[in-house]
């Protein structure tokens, strides 16, 4: 078995390294100290095709694999863990929650391109004050109302949250089934009743 990187993988690795050294590294400490997120860096990642690396081209991905994606995340995270986490949340957690779910082709074509290509941030809404790694403590509930759902609950420690336009939100849909009824909903930032609360001053990864 050949464990060497192929030419395409080496090219992506070098592209990520060069971008990181030139554009990410110069102000990384300032961003961490001020807890500021540079959206332009994320847009650069979109322009280079990094955000959609592992997804099919029909959903504006690059049609490559997770090795290529991991190499890009690794190079960026070496210098700026916050940007690396932001990148991986948008790609793996937001994008993956849609791509590997029961989302329809119409939904994928509506909600993948804005985050993978157009520079809009995506977030993953799972963690709550009572539920994180243990999702059985989840309280957020989605009640069906005709053709729509009304979601009540709150999430915390949501990477990209303050600036995201799209959120994959996890919620219970049946009180009796509990965690077995958890479903994924895409919530757009301008949805009526949706608000973003105060930001926590975390120990690390402060500018994500």
Model-derived regions: residue spans:
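A structural signal for short hydrophobic beta-strand segments in well-ordered beta-sheet cores
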Residues: 140-143
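Residue-level signal for inorganic ion chemistry
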Residues: 9, 20, 72, 104, ...
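Short Gly/Pro-enriched turn/cap motifs at secondary-structure boundaries
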Residues: 130-133, 157-160, 174-176, 201-207
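Hydrophobic, small-residue-rich alpha-helical packing segments that form membrane-like cores
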Residues: 133-134, 149
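A short core secondary-structure module
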Residues: 148, 152-197
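Internal helix-loop-helix
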Residues: 47-121, 160-166, 178
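Flexible, small-/acidic-enriched active-site or ligand-binding loops
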Residues: 137, 190-208
């Amino acid at each position: 078995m050949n464990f060497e990187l192929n030419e395409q993988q080496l090219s992506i690795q070098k592209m990520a390294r060069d971008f990181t050294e030139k554009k990410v590294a110069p102000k990384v400490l300032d961003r961490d100290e001020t807890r500021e997120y540079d959206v332009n860096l994320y847009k650069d990642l979109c322009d280079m095709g990094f955000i959609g690396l592992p997804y099919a081209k029909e959903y504006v991905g690059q049609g490559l694999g997770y090795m290529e994606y991991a190499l890009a995340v690794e190079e960026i995270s070496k210098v700026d863990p916050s940007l690396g986490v932001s990148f991986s949340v948008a790609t793996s957690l937001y994008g993956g929650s849609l791509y590997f779910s029961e989302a329809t082709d119409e939904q994928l074509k509506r909600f993948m391109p804005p985050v993978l290509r157009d520079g809009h941030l995506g977030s993953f809404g799972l963690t709550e004050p009572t539920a994180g790694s243990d999702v059985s403590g989840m309280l957020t509930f989605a009640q069906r109302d005709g053709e729509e759902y009304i979601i009540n609950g709150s999430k915390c420690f949501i990477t990209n949250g303050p600036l995201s336009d799209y959120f994959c939100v996890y919620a219970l849909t049946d009180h009796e089934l509990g965690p077995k009824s958890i479903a994924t909903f895409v919530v757009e930032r301008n949805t009526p009743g949706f608000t973003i609360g105060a930001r926590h001053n975390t120990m690390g990864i402060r500018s994500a």
